[in-house]
Swiss-Prot record:
Complex and partners: Homotrimer.
Protein name per its UniProtKB record: Bifunctional protein GlmU
Note describing how the cofactor binds: Binds 1 Mg(2+) ion per subunit.
Reaction(s) this enzyme catalyzes, per UniProt: alpha-D-glucosamine 1-phosphate + acetyl-CoA = N-acetyl-alpha-D-glucosamine 1-phosphate + CoA + H(+); N-acetyl-alpha-D-glucosamine 1-phosphate + UTP + H(+) = UDP-N-acetyl-alpha-D-glucosamine + diphosphate
Pfam assignment, any one: Hexapep
Residues forming the catalytic site: 362 (proton acceptor)
InterPro entries: Bifunctional_GlmU, GlmU-like, GlmU_C_LbH, Hexapep, Hexapep_transf_CS, NTP_transferase_dom, Nucleotide-diphossugar_trans, Trimer_LpxA-like_sf
Entry GO terms, CC: cytoplasm; membrane
List of residues binding Mg(2+): 102, 227
Organism of origin: Staphylococcus epidermidis
Region (Linker): 230-250
Amino acid sequence: MQRHAIILAAGKGTRMKSKKYKVLHEVAGKPMVEHVLNNVKQAGVDQIVTIIGHGAESVKDTLGNQSLYSFQDKQLGTAHAVKMAHEHLADKEGTTLVVCGDTPLITYQTLQSLIEHHESTQSHVTVLSASTINPYGYGRIIRNHNGILERIVEEKDANDSERAIKEISSGIFAFNNRVLFEKLEQVKNDNAQGEYYLPDVLSLILKDGGKAEVYCTEDFDEIIGVNDRLMLSEAEKALQQRINRYHMENGVTIIDPSSTFIGTDVKIGIDTTIEPGVRIGGHTTIEEDVWIGQYSEINNSTIHSNANIKQSVINDSIVGENXXVGPFAQLRPGSNLGSEVKVGNFVEVKKADIKDGAKVSHLSYIGDAEIGERTNIGCGSITVNYDGANKFKTIVGKDAFIGCNTNLIAPVTVGNHTLIAAGSTITDNIPEDSLALARARQVNKEGYLKK
Protein backbone atom coordinates (compact mmCIF):
# COMPACT_ATOMS: atom_id res chain seq x y z
CA MET A 1 0.00 0.00 0.00
CA GLN A 2 1.25 3.47 -0.88
CA ARG A 3 2.02 5.80 2.01
CA HIS A 4 2.08 9.57 1.77
CA ALA A 5 2.58 12.37 4.29
CA ILE A 6 1.56 16.00 4.54
CA ILE A 7 3.62 18.23 6.85
CA LEU A 8 1.88 21.44 7.89
CA ALA A 9 4.51 24.20 7.98
CA ALA A 10 2.79 27.36 6.72
CA GLY A 11 2.21 29.21 10.00
CA LYS A 12 4.19 32.30 10.94
CA GLY A 13 4.17 31.64 14.68
CA THR A 14 3.40 35.12 16.00
CA ARG A 15 3.65 33.95 19.61
CA MET A 16 7.34 33.24 19.04
CA LYS A 17 7.85 37.00 18.62
CA SER A 18 10.65 36.32 16.17
CA LYS A 19 11.86 37.22 12.69
CA LYS A 20 12.43 33.50 12.17
CA TYR A 21 9.44 31.42 11.09
CA LYS A 22 8.12 29.05 13.71
CA VAL A 23 9.01 25.66 12.23
CA LEU A 24 12.60 26.83 11.63
CA HIS A 25 13.32 27.38 15.31
CA GLU A 26 15.82 24.77 16.44
CA VAL A 27 15.55 21.97 18.95
CA ALA A 28 18.76 20.03 19.66
CA GLY A 29 20.51 22.04 16.96
CA LYS A 30 18.07 21.24 14.16
CA PRO A 31 14.95 23.06 12.84
CA MET A 32 11.72 21.59 14.19
CA VAL A 33 10.36 20.85 10.73
CA GLU A 34 13.52 18.90 9.88
CA HIS A 35 13.01 16.69 12.94
CA VAL A 36 9.46 16.02 11.75
CA LEU A 37 10.48 15.25 8.18
CA ASN A 38 13.25 12.87 9.28
CA ASN A 39 10.86 10.89 11.48
CA VAL A 40 8.19 10.80 8.77
CA LYS A 41 10.76 9.38 6.35
CA GLN A 42 11.86 6.74 8.85
CA ALA A 43 8.23 5.73 9.37
CA GLY A 44 8.21 4.32 5.85
CA VAL A 45 6.45 7.06 3.88
CA ASP A 46 6.89 7.02 0.10
CA GLN A 47 6.10 10.65 -0.70
CA ILE A 48 6.10 13.81 1.45
CA VAL A 49 4.34 17.09 0.69
CA THR A 50 5.13 20.08 2.90
CA ILE A 51 2.59 22.90 3.08
CA ILE A 52 4.44 26.21 3.14
CA GLY A 53 3.30 29.81 3.51
CA HIS A 54 5.15 32.24 5.75
CA GLY A 55 8.87 31.83 5.18
CA ALA A 56 8.25 29.51 2.23
CA GLU A 57 11.69 29.91 0.67
CA SER A 58 13.45 29.46 4.01
CA VAL A 59 11.56 26.23 4.67
CA LYS A 60 12.35 24.96 1.16
CA ASP A 61 16.02 25.83 1.65
CA THR A 62 16.01 23.82 4.88
CA LEU A 63 14.30 20.69 3.56
CA GLY A 64 15.54 20.81 -0.02
CA ASN A 65 14.47 18.02 -2.36
CA GLN A 66 13.43 15.70 0.45
CA SER A 67 9.86 16.95 0.00
CA LEU A 68 7.39 18.25 -2.54
CA TYR A 69 5.78 21.59 -1.69
CA SER A 70 2.36 23.23 -1.86
CA PHE A 71 1.80 26.89 -1.05
CA GLN A 72 -0.93 28.15 1.31
CA ASP A 73 -1.39 31.85 0.64
CA LYS A 74 -3.85 32.51 3.47
CA GLN A 75 -3.79 30.50 6.69
CA LEU A 76 -7.46 29.53 6.99
CA GLY A 77 -7.10 26.45 9.18
CA THR A 78 -5.65 22.96 9.14
CA ALA A 79 -8.19 21.48 6.72
CA HIS A 80 -7.52 24.31 4.29
CA ALA A 81 -3.78 23.67 4.61
CA VAL A 82 -4.14 19.95 3.88
CA LYS A 83 -6.34 20.77 0.89
CA MET A 84 -3.38 22.61 -0.66
CA ALA A 85 -1.72 19.21 -1.26
CA HIS A 86 -4.48 18.39 -3.77
CA GLU A 87 -2.16 18.96 -6.73
CA HIS A 88 0.20 16.21 -5.58
CA LEU A 89 -2.01 13.67 -3.80
CA ALA A 90 -5.68 13.92 -4.75
CA ASP A 91 -5.55 11.06 -7.26
CA LYS A 92 -3.40 8.76 -5.11
CA GLU A 93 -4.42 5.55 -3.37
CA GLY A 94 -3.24 4.41 0.05
CA THR A 95 -2.65 6.04 3.42
CA THR A 96 -1.86 9.69 4.04
CA LEU A 97 -0.26 10.82 7.28
CA VAL A 98 -0.89 14.42 8.37
CA VAL A 99 1.55 15.85 10.90
CA CYS A 100 2.34 19.35 12.13
CA GLY A 101 5.77 20.84 11.48
CA ASP A 102 6.02 22.16 15.04
CA THR A 103 6.02 18.74 16.76
CA PRO A 104 9.75 17.98 16.96
CA LEU A 105 9.41 15.27 19.61
CA ILE A 106 7.29 12.87 17.58
CA THR A 107 9.17 9.61 16.92
CA TYR A 108 9.16 7.51 13.80
CA GLN A 109 8.20 4.49 15.91
CA THR A 110 4.96 6.17 17.00
CA LEU A 111 4.17 7.32 13.46
CA GLN A 112 4.87 3.83 12.19
CA SER A 113 2.56 2.31 14.82
CA LEU A 114 -0.16 4.83 13.97
CA ILE A 115 -0.01 3.94 10.28
CA GLU A 116 0.05 0.20 10.97
CA HIS A 117 -2.93 0.45 13.34
CA HIS A 118 -4.82 2.50 10.76
CA GLU A 119 -4.16 0.01 7.97
CA SER A 120 -4.72 -3.14 10.03
CA THR A 121 -8.14 -1.89 11.19
CA GLN A 122 -9.03 -0.78 7.65
CA SER A 123 -10.12 2.59 9.00
CA HIS A 124 -10.90 5.68 6.99
CA VAL A 125 -9.24 7.87 9.61
CA THR A 126 -7.13 7.26 12.72
CA VAL A 127 -6.19 10.02 15.14
CA LEU A 128 -3.13 9.95 17.39
CA SER A 129 -4.11 10.82 20.96
CA ALA A 130 -2.50 11.13 24.39
CA SER A 131 -3.65 11.82 27.93
CA THR A 132 -2.39 14.68 30.07
CA ILE A 133 -3.17 16.28 33.41
CA ASN A 134 -3.34 19.71 31.78
CA PRO A 135 -5.10 19.46 28.40
CA TYR A 136 -5.50 23.22 27.95
CA GLY A 137 -5.16 24.36 24.35
CA TYR A 138 -5.66 20.94 22.77
CA GLY A 139 -8.67 19.48 20.98
CA ARG A 140 -10.47 16.87 23.11
CA ILE A 141 -11.23 13.29 22.09
CA ILE A 142 -14.97 12.75 22.57
CA ARG A 143 -16.03 9.11 22.96
CA ASN A 144 -19.47 7.58 23.47
CA HIS A 145 -20.45 5.39 26.42
CA ASN A 146 -18.89 2.39 24.64
CA GLY A 147 -15.57 4.16 24.26
CA ILE A 148 -16.01 4.62 20.53
CA LEU A 149 -14.72 7.85 18.99
CA GLU A 150 -17.51 10.31 18.23
CA ARG A 151 -15.70 13.52 17.35
CA ILE A 152 -12.89 15.91 18.23
CA VAL A 153 -13.79 19.29 19.68
CA GLU A 154 -11.36 22.20 19.71
CA GLU A 155 -10.58 24.00 22.98
CA LYS A 156 -12.33 27.21 21.96
CA ASP A 157 -15.47 25.35 20.86
CA ALA A 158 -15.67 22.97 23.85
CA ASN A 159 -18.16 23.26 26.70
CA ASP A 160 -17.16 22.85 30.35
CA SER A 161 -17.68 19.07 30.47
CA GLU A 162 -15.71 18.59 27.26
CA ARG A 163 -12.86 20.76 28.56
CA ALA A 164 -12.60 18.43 31.57
CA ILE A 165 -11.63 15.51 29.30
CA LYS A 166 -7.95 14.57 29.64
CA GLU A 167 -7.51 12.67 26.36
CA ILE A 168 -6.47 15.08 23.66
CA SER A 169 -5.90 15.03 19.93
CA SER A 170 -2.31 15.40 18.81
CA GLY A 171 -3.34 16.94 15.50
CA ILE A 172 -1.65 13.98 13.81
CA PHE A 173 -3.87 11.77 11.64
CA ALA A 174 -3.71 8.83 9.27
CA PHE A 175 -6.32 8.95 6.49
CA ASN A 176 -7.51 6.89 3.60
CA ASN A 177 -6.21 9.28 0.96
CA ARG A 178 -9.22 9.15 -1.38
CA VAL A 179 -11.65 9.69 1.50
CA LEU A 180 -9.54 12.56 2.87
CA PHE A 181 -9.69 14.65 -0.30
CA GLU A 182 -13.34 13.83 -0.89
CA LYS A 183 -14.33 15.07 2.58
CA LEU A 184 -12.08 18.14 2.48
CA GLU A 185 -14.45 19.57 -0.13
CA GLN A 186 -17.29 19.40 2.42
CA VAL A 187 -15.59 21.07 5.40
CA LYS A 188 -17.16 24.37 6.51
CA ASN A 189 -15.83 27.16 8.72
CA ASP A 190 -18.86 27.72 10.98
CA ASN A 191 -16.92 27.76 14.26
CA ALA A 192 -15.60 30.30 16.77
CA GLN A 193 -12.43 30.93 14.76
CA GLY A 194 -13.99 30.97 11.31
CA GLU A 195 -11.43 28.40 10.17
CA TYR A 196 -11.55 25.09 8.32
CA TYR A 197 -10.63 22.42 10.87
CA LEU A 198 -9.09 19.09 9.90
CA PRO A 199 -10.96 17.26 12.71
CA ASP A 200 -14.17 18.13 10.85
CA VAL A 201 -13.07 15.65 8.18
CA LEU A 202 -13.27 12.99 10.89
CA SER A 203 -16.79 14.13 11.81
CA LEU A 204 -17.88 13.95 8.17
CA ILE A 205 -16.45 10.45 7.84
CA LEU A 206 -18.37 9.29 10.92
CA LYS A 207 -21.54 11.00 9.73
CA ASP A 208 -21.41 8.98 6.52
CA GLY A 209 -20.86 5.73 8.41
CA GLY A 210 -17.13 5.55 7.88
CA LYS A 211 -14.72 3.94 10.33
CA ALA A 212 -12.64 6.07 12.71
CA GLU A 213 -10.03 4.81 15.16
CA VAL A 214 -7.86 6.27 17.92
CA TYR A 215 -4.25 5.25 18.50
CA CYS A 216 -3.01 6.46 21.90
CA THR A 217 0.66 7.11 22.64
CA GLU A 218 1.81 6.74 26.24
CA ASP A 219 4.35 9.55 25.94
CA PHE A 220 2.57 12.90 25.95
CA ASP A 221 5.86 14.72 25.26
CA GLU A 222 5.88 13.28 21.74
CA ILE A 223 2.90 15.33 20.65
CA ILE A 224 3.90 18.67 22.17
CA GLY A 225 3.28 21.44 19.66
CA VAL A 226 5.69 24.35 20.01
CA ASN A 227 3.98 27.74 19.78
CA ASP A 228 6.15 30.03 21.93
CA ARG A 229 9.62 30.29 23.47
CA LEU A 230 8.54 28.62 26.69
CA MET A 231 7.28 25.57 24.81
CA LEU A 232 10.44 25.63 22.71
CA SER A 233 12.55 25.35 25.86
CA GLU A 234 10.33 22.53 27.14
CA ALA A 235 10.77 20.67 23.86
CA GLU A 236 14.55 21.18 24.03
CA LYS A 237 14.63 19.81 27.56
CA ALA A 238 12.49 16.79 26.69
CA LEU A 239 14.52 15.91 23.61
CA GLN A 240 17.83 16.29 25.45
CA GLN A 241 16.58 13.98 28.17
CA ARG A 242 15.62 11.42 25.53
CA ILE A 243 18.96 11.69 23.72
CA ASN A 244 21.05 11.52 26.89
CA ARG A 245 19.05 8.59 28.22
CA TYR A 246 19.65 6.71 24.97
CA HIS A 247 23.42 7.18 25.19
CA MET A 248 23.58 6.27 28.88
CA GLU A 249 21.56 3.12 28.22
CA ASN A 250 24.14 2.24 25.57
CA GLY A 251 27.26 2.50 27.72
CA VAL A 252 28.14 6.20 27.85
CA THR A 253 28.76 7.96 31.17
CA ILE A 254 27.17 11.41 31.29
CA ILE A 255 28.02 12.91 34.66
CA ASP A 256 25.37 15.65 34.59
CA PRO A 257 22.71 15.02 31.93
CA SER A 258 20.89 18.25 32.80
CA SER A 259 23.82 20.35 31.54
CA THR A 260 24.91 18.13 28.64
CA PHE A 261 23.61 18.87 25.14
CA ILE A 262 23.98 16.23 22.41
CA GLY A 263 22.56 16.42 18.88
CA THR A 264 20.35 13.79 17.29
CA ASP A 265 22.97 12.76 14.71
CA VAL A 266 25.80 12.20 17.21
CA LYS A 267 27.24 8.69 17.67
CA ILE A 268 29.13 7.82 20.88
CA GLY A 269 31.03 4.63 21.72
CA ILE A 270 30.90 2.71 24.98
CA ASP A 271 32.90 3.72 28.05
CA THR A 272 33.18 7.31 26.91
CA THR A 273 32.80 9.83 29.73
CA ILE A 274 31.24 13.25 29.27
CA GLU A 275 31.68 15.88 31.97
CA PRO A 276 29.17 18.69 32.73
CA GLY A 277 28.57 21.57 30.36
CA VAL A 278 29.55 19.72 27.18
CA ARG A 279 27.87 20.41 23.81
CA ILE A 280 28.21 17.90 20.96
CA GLY A 281 26.42 18.56 17.69
CA GLY A 282 26.24 17.96 13.97
CA HIS A 283 27.36 14.67 12.46
CA THR A 284 29.91 13.90 15.16
CA THR A 285 31.27 10.42 15.87
CA ILE A 286 32.99 9.72 19.17
CA GLU A 287 34.57 6.30 19.55
CA GLU A 288 35.11 4.22 22.69
CA ASP A 289 36.93 5.23 25.88
CA VAL A 290 37.05 8.94 25.09
CA TRP A 291 37.12 11.52 27.89
CA ILE A 292 35.41 14.83 27.12
CA GLY A 293 36.13 17.45 29.75
CA GLN A 294 33.72 20.03 31.03
CA TYR A 295 32.52 22.87 28.81
CA SER A 296 34.00 21.39 25.64
CA GLU A 297 32.17 21.97 22.36
CA ILE A 298 32.43 19.51 19.47
CA ASN A 299 30.68 19.84 16.09
CA ASN A 300 30.82 17.73 12.92
CA SER A 301 33.98 15.96 14.04
CA THR A 302 35.42 12.50 14.62
CA ILE A 303 37.11 11.68 17.91
CA HIS A 304 38.92 8.34 17.89
CA SER A 305 39.34 5.94 20.80
CA ASN A 306 41.08 6.93 24.05
CA ALA A 307 41.33 10.59 23.13
CA ASN A 308 41.23 13.13 25.94
CA ILE A 309 39.50 16.46 25.30
CA LYS A 310 39.80 19.14 28.00
CA GLN A 311 37.73 22.33 27.84
CA SER A 312 38.24 22.83 24.11
CA VAL A 313 36.33 23.74 20.95
CA ILE A 314 36.50 21.35 17.99
CA ASN A 315 34.78 21.99 14.64
CA ASP A 316 34.89 19.88 11.46
CA SER A 317 38.05 18.11 12.58
CA ILE A 318 39.52 14.69 13.35
CA VAL A 319 41.30 13.69 16.57
CA GLY A 320 43.28 10.45 16.42
CA GLU A 321 43.60 7.62 18.93
CA ASN A 322 45.20 8.50 22.27
CA UNK A 323 45.44 12.13 21.29
CA UNK A 324 45.16 14.91 23.88
CA VAL A 325 43.51 18.25 23.20
CA GLY A 326 43.45 21.18 25.61
CA PRO A 327 42.76 22.66 27.96
CA PHE A 328 41.52 25.72 26.10
CA ALA A 329 42.54 24.60 22.61
CA GLN A 330 40.63 25.29 19.41
CA LEU A 331 40.55 22.98 16.40
CA ARG A 332 39.05 24.88 13.49
CA PRO A 333 37.71 23.24 10.31
CA GLY A 334 40.11 20.98 8.47
CA SER A 335 42.27 20.04 11.46
CA ASN A 336 43.43 16.42 11.36
CA LEU A 337 45.34 15.08 14.35
CA GLY A 338 47.02 11.68 14.15
CA SER A 339 47.41 9.21 17.00
CA GLU A 340 49.31 10.20 20.16
CA VAL A 341 49.21 13.87 19.12
CA LYS A 342 49.17 16.54 21.80
CA VAL A 343 47.58 19.94 21.21
CA GLY A 344 47.87 21.79 24.48
CA ASN A 345 46.60 24.88 26.22
CA PHE A 346 45.82 27.97 24.15
CA VAL A 347 46.75 26.35 20.85
CA GLU A 348 44.74 27.09 17.70
CA VAL A 349 44.86 24.72 14.74
CA LYS A 350 43.23 25.37 11.37
CA LYS A 351 43.32 23.30 8.17
CA ALA A 352 46.39 21.41 9.30
CA ASP A 353 47.57 17.79 9.37
CA ILE A 354 49.50 17.00 12.53
CA LYS A 355 50.98 13.53 12.18
CA ASP A 356 51.32 10.75 14.75
CA GLY A 357 53.18 11.62 17.92
CA ALA A 358 53.67 15.31 17.17
CA LYS A 359 53.29 17.88 19.96
CA VAL A 360 52.07 21.46 19.96
CA SER A 361 51.91 21.96 23.68
CA HIS A 362 51.24 25.64 24.34
CA LEU A 363 50.38 29.07 22.99
CA SER A 364 50.78 28.37 19.27
CA TYR A 365 48.93 28.88 16.00
CA ILE A 366 49.22 26.14 13.35
CA GLY A 367 47.30 27.03 10.19
CA ASP A 368 47.50 25.71 6.62
CA ALA A 369 50.26 23.36 7.66
CA GLU A 370 51.57 19.82 7.70
CA ILE A 371 53.53 18.73 10.78
CA GLY A 372 55.47 15.47 10.57
CA GLU A 373 55.59 12.53 12.95
CA ARG A 374 57.08 13.13 16.41
CA THR A 375 57.89 16.77 15.68
CA ASN A 376 57.79 19.15 18.64
CA ILE A 377 56.49 22.69 18.18
CA GLY A 378 57.82 24.94 20.94
CA CYS A 379 55.77 27.37 23.01
CA GLY A 380 54.68 30.51 21.16
CA SER A 381 55.57 29.25 17.69
CA ILE A 382 53.31 30.15 14.79
CA THR A 383 52.88 29.48 11.10
CA VAL A 384 52.62 32.85 9.36
CA ASN A 385 50.25 31.78 6.62
CA TYR A 386 48.55 34.97 5.41
CA ASP A 387 50.00 37.94 3.52
CA GLY A 388 46.80 39.97 3.57
CA ALA A 389 45.51 38.50 0.32
CA ASN A 390 46.42 34.81 0.10
CA LYS A 391 47.04 31.82 2.38
CA PHE A 392 50.25 29.79 2.08
CA LYS A 393 51.29 26.39 3.40
CA THR A 394 53.97 25.42 5.90
CA ILE A 395 55.45 21.91 5.79
CA VAL A 396 57.51 20.61 8.70
CA GLY A 397 59.07 17.16 8.40
CA LYS A 398 59.24 14.41 10.98
CA ASP A 399 61.39 14.39 14.13
CA ALA A 400 61.96 18.14 13.94
CA PHE A 401 62.36 20.40 16.98
CA ILE A 402 60.97 23.90 16.58
CA GLY A 403 62.24 26.19 19.34
CA CYS A 404 60.01 28.52 21.32
CA ASN A 405 58.73 31.73 19.74
CA THR A 406 59.56 30.67 16.18
CA ASN A 407 57.84 32.32 13.21
CA LEU A 408 57.54 30.10 10.13
CA ILE A 409 56.86 32.47 7.21
CA ALA A 410 54.90 30.49 4.60
CA PRO A 411 55.38 29.17 2.04
CA VAL A 412 58.24 27.32 3.68
CA THR A 413 59.43 23.73 4.11
CA VAL A 414 61.38 22.46 7.12
CA GLY A 415 63.14 19.16 6.53
CA ASN A 416 63.20 16.01 8.65
CA HIS A 417 65.27 15.91 11.83
CA THR A 418 65.94 19.64 11.93
CA LEU A 419 66.41 22.03 14.84
CA ILE A 420 65.29 25.65 14.81
CA ALA A 421 66.73 27.87 17.51
CA ALA A 422 64.28 29.67 19.77
CA GLY A 423 63.19 33.12 18.63
CA SER A 424 63.95 32.52 14.96
CA THR A 425 61.98 33.92 12.04
CA ILE A 426 62.28 31.40 9.22
CA THR A 427 61.77 32.65 5.67
CA ASP A 428 63.74 30.04 3.67
CA ASN A 429 63.49 26.27 3.35
CA ILE A 430 65.63 24.24 5.76
CA PRO A 431 67.34 21.02 4.59
CA GLU A 432 67.02 17.92 6.75
CA ASP A 433 69.48 17.29 9.58
CA SER A 434 70.15 21.05 9.83
CA LEU A 435 70.27 23.65 12.58
CA ALA A 436 68.65 26.97 11.65
CA LEU A 437 69.19 30.25 13.48
CA ALA A 438 67.49 33.41 12.28
CA ARG A 439 67.74 36.08 14.94
CA ALA A 440 69.91 39.07 15.81
CA ARG A 441 73.00 38.41 17.90
CA GLN A 442 72.69 39.55 21.53
CA VAL A 443 74.82 42.53 22.50
CA ASN A 444 75.44 43.43 26.18
CA LYS A 445 76.68 46.95 26.98
CA GLU A 446 77.99 46.70 30.52
CA GLY A 447 77.53 49.70 32.80
CA TYR A 448 75.32 51.47 30.26
CA LEU A 449 72.66 52.44 32.83
CA LYS A 450 75.20 53.93 35.24
CA LYS A 451 75.99 56.77 32.87
